[in-house]
Amino acid sequence: MRKGRGSSVVGPALPVTAGGSVKEPRYRGVRKRPWGRFAAEIRDPLKKSRVWLGTFDSAVDAARAYDTAARNLRGPKAKTNFPIDCSPSSPLQPLTYLHNQNLCSPPVIQNQIDPFMDHRLYGGGNFQEQQQQQIISRPASSSMSSTVKSCSGPRPMEAAAASSSVAKPLHAIKRYPRTPPVAPEDCHSDCDSSSSVIDDGDDIASSSSRRKTPFQFDLNFPPLDGVDLFAGGIDDLHCTDLRL
């Protein structure tokens, strides 16, 4: 049984001189010194001068130093002695990776804020209903009768609108122009201890009982002579028991 031959790598044939000695290959940018070392240098296209790269023990090391300098000066169009090495040890791979990463990165979009817009969170639903709710919650003008209710906490309608606006997704946010401010003379609010006040022209009527003139006497002093306590009528007299 015949065995197959193993694969072998055959190097390039070196030129041979007439005397039988092997001629060393010549590399771009490499010169051999008389004492046996190899010097590498390259021409700078911008400065129009030669740049010294150093002295090496072998011609291959000097040729690789020239190739590295040529790629740094001329880029991918540089003429080199050896093809570009695609292995991870290549010094040009990190630069190529960073360049590709910058090209693939998306551009940064800056959100420009318009100072003339009122950024309110309006939902993507019916905007007219929200305007009607604002008109109802706003007090009417002085020409029309209105009821102003005094309260210490936030209005339930506004609280519900705020909670619904926060619950809406971000893609449903819209911007609308700022509503004009209401003039202070368009609304009148006379709030005191009474629950509600009705303003109808010059006639102001309170839902609570009208204020009545107090009796002209003081409980801290004895009754005065000549003062009619029942001048306002018996209906206005309210008896109160004082207990000490």
UniProtKB/Swiss-Prot annotation:
Keywords: DNA-binding, Ethylene signaling pathway, Nucleus, Phosphoprotein, Plant defense, Repressor, Transcription, Transcription regulation. It is found in: Nucleus. GO terms for molecular function: DNA-binding transcription factor activity; sequence-specific DNA binding; transcription cis-regulatory region binding. Residues 141-152, 192-208 have a biased composition (Low complexity). The keyword Metal-binding does not apply. Residues 136-156, 181-209 are annotated as: Disordered. Phosphorylated by PKS3. One of its GO terms (cellular component) is nucleus. A motif (EAR-like (transcriptional repression)) lies at residues 217-223. Pfam families: AP2. GO terms for biological process: defense response; ethylene-activated signaling pathway; negative regulation of DNA-templated transcription; regulation of DNA-templated transcription; response to abscisic acid; response to water deprivation. Signal peptide: none annotated. Residues 26-83 bind DNA. Involved in the regulation of gene expression by abscisic acid, stress factors and by components of stress signal transduction pathways. Transcription factor that binds to the GCC-box pathogenesis-related promoter element. Part of a transcriptional repressor complex including a histone deacetylase. Contains a slightly degenerated ERF-associated amphiphilic repression (EAR) motif, which may be involved in the activity of transcriptional repression. Belongs to the AP2/ERF transcription factor family. ERF subfamily. Interacts with SIN3 and HDA19. This is Ethylene-responsive transcription factor 7. It comes from Arabidopsis thaliana (Mouse-ear cress). The lineage of its organism: Eukaryota, Viridiplantae, Streptophyta, Embryophyta, Tracheophyta. The gene is ERF7.
